[in-house]
């Protein structure tokens, strides 16, 4: 049976832990909001790219481009996007588990995030390069990753490039996904589904475009930027997912600590009350004697 001193020591220790997890929860919540805001700021540019692509396609005939070339897949590259840190529940393990489905003999990995790089090194899989990205992913970080993947594809070192990452749905839901990257199929976006377009934003669909010198020239230029924008949206989704999962994980830890503290306080008070009652009975018995 625990002594009052042991219980006080445990209560003090768990209280300190609860204060730490609460602080980490608040930090993660702040970073999550920033990641979502970054996605909102980038969204109009993404929408414009997709609208221009759709319009340019209607003005072109049989348009061919190396980034659109579909080849028999003998070797592939996978851009594996993970978190930099842990304490975010099953988020990392869910993404890394999907990476194990690829044949290690024919797959080379490009990693983004420390946990992804550590996993590839630990499992001794082929690694083309590893990248890092901050709490607020930048376009330059996305461009570096997209550039390497594009070069591998254009040099015929790989026949296909896919992405394994986490799609942010909401604070409680993050879904590990496998996305097609190269060759480029239908151009589309990875918008955060929890955010809505601002009514003040101009609609790209209502805009008339004039292509100079030609739709084909514009499309060739557009495809390169599309790859960068797509990776940027993937990174923003991954970071929002990481911070959301960490916030929920820390909130659960804080709630569990609070419940444990409550139970220990109850046990401590019962033990203390029992000791007081015992002492009073001993005193009363002594006087009676």
Give the ranges of each region predicted by the language model:
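C-terminal beta-strand-loop-alpha-helix "lid" module of Rossmann-like NAD(P)-dependent dehydrogenases
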Residues: 1-289
């Amino acid at each position: 049976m625990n002594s009052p001193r042991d219980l006080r020591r445990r209560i003090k220790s768990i209280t300190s832990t609860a204060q730490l997890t609460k602080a980490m929860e608040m930090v993660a919540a702040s970073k999550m909001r920033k990641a979502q805001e970054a996605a909102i700021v980038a969204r109009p540019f993404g929408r414009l790219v997709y609208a221009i692509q759709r319009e340019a396609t209607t003005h072109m005939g049989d348009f061919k481009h190396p980034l659109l070339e579909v080849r028999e897949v003998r070797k592939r590259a996978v851009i594996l996007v993970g978190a930099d840190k842990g304490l975010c529940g099953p988020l990392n393990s869910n993404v890394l588990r999907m990476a194990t489905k690829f044949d290690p003999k024919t797959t080379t990995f490009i990693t983004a995030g420390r946990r992804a790089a550590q996993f590839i090194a630990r499992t001794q899989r082929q690694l083309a390069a590893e990248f890092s990205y901050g709490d607020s992913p930048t376009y330059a970080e996305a461009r570096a990753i997209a550039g390497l993947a594009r070069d591998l594809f254009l040099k015929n070192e790989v026949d296909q490039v896919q992405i394994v990452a986490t799609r942010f749905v909401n604070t409680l839901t993050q879904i590990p996904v496998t996305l097609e990257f190269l060759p480029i199929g239908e151009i589309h976006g990875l918008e955060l589904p929890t955010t809505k377009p601002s009514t003040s934003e101009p609609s790209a669909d209502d805009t008339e475009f004039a292509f100079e010198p030609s739709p084909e020239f514009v499309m060739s230029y557009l495809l390169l930027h599309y790859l960068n924008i797509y990776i940027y949206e993937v990174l923003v989704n991954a970071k929002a997912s990481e911070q959301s999962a960490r916030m929920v994980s820390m909130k659960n830890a804080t709630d569990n600590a609070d419940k444990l503290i409550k139970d220990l306080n109850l046990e401590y008070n019962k033990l203390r009350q029992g000791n007081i009652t015992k002492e009073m009975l001993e005193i009363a018995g002594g006087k009676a004697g």
